[in-house]
Amino acid sequence: MGIKNLNSVTPSLRGTVLLDKSTLWKGRPEKSLVGYKISHGGRNSRGVITVRHRGKGHKRLYRIIDFKRKKVGVPATVERLEYDPNRTAFIALLSYDDGEKSYIIAPHGLKKGDVIMSGNGSDILPGNCLMLKLIPVGTFVHNVELRPGGGGIIARSAGTYAQLMSKDGIYVLLRLSSGEIRKVLADCCATIGIVSNLDNQNVKLGKAGRSRWLGIRPTVRGVAMNPIDHPHGGGEGKTSGGRNPVTPWGVSTKGKKTRKKNKSSNKYIKRVSDKG
């Protein structure tokens, strides 16, 4: 899977760069592995906006993903790769030898017909899942657990990864794609490989409508608002805001660290993210 550049037939296509999904499954998802997902438009139970820039978007079914890889020691064949509207990564439909099916996040390089397995006897190949203490130093992994048996949490979006840096007793050191270096229990499981859809960062939607299909509403500049709505609002005529850029709640937007200093998980982070 790569990207496709479109010809400038219309103004909205000029500069548009989209994903090439020609190799992905074009039919409906596996019926036994989907559920309904209701869009709340960023509102809570009282109807108050708690997440800005969220809209309805296109109707979608939720694909139930196996983040725990519970079928230990049972080989599974990749039936197909699919697009998932609920995440940036592609997903793979697995068919186990005992007849059960499940969806997993597809790693880069996985293709139809590949055989993968979960368990401590698995080979170091993309898609196989095993404990971190059994994975060689330097290996790229994804879908990493923070608690043994709790299911993968770290590195699940398109193109992300965690690299195993070293092993130290009951912990291992992982370097995340953000630059953060973090301690994780060695008994936690991870899946070998980098998450698929590496070209997702190169996509240019090209028009507002494509953002609305994804459920993204417009972002209004603070200087275009009234003083009651934003610290940059108001003024006579067009103004530049009159202060350093801040959020609607007055927090600096130019590199201010927002992580709490007394957070309990700080002891597991050896180096903070390059991205703040």
Swiss-Prot record:
Presence of the UniProt keyword RNA-binding in the record: yes
Any one biological process term the GO annotation gives: cytoplasmic translation
UniProt-listed Pfam families: Ribosomal_L2, Ribosomal_L2_C
UniProt key word Ribosomal protein: yes
Keywords associated with the record: Ribonucleoprotein, Ribosomal protein, RNA-binding, rRNA-binding
Gene Ontology, cellular component aspect: large ribosomal subunit
Listed GO MF terms: rRNA binding; structural constituent of ribosome; transferase activity
Quaternary structure and partners: Part of the 50S ribosomal subunit. Forms a bridge to the 30S subunit in the 70S ribosome.
Function in brief: One of the primary rRNA binding proteins. Required for association of the 30S and 50S subunits to form the 70S ribosome, for tRNA binding and peptide bond formation. It has been suggested to have peptidyltransferase activity; this is somewhat controversial. Makes several contacts with the 16S rRNA in the 70S ribosome.
HAMAP family found in the cross-reference section: Ribosomal_uL2_B (MF_01320_B)
Official protein name in the record: Large ribosomal subunit protein uL2
Organism lineage: Bacteria, Pseudomonadati, Pseudomonadota, Alphaproteobacteria, Rickettsiales
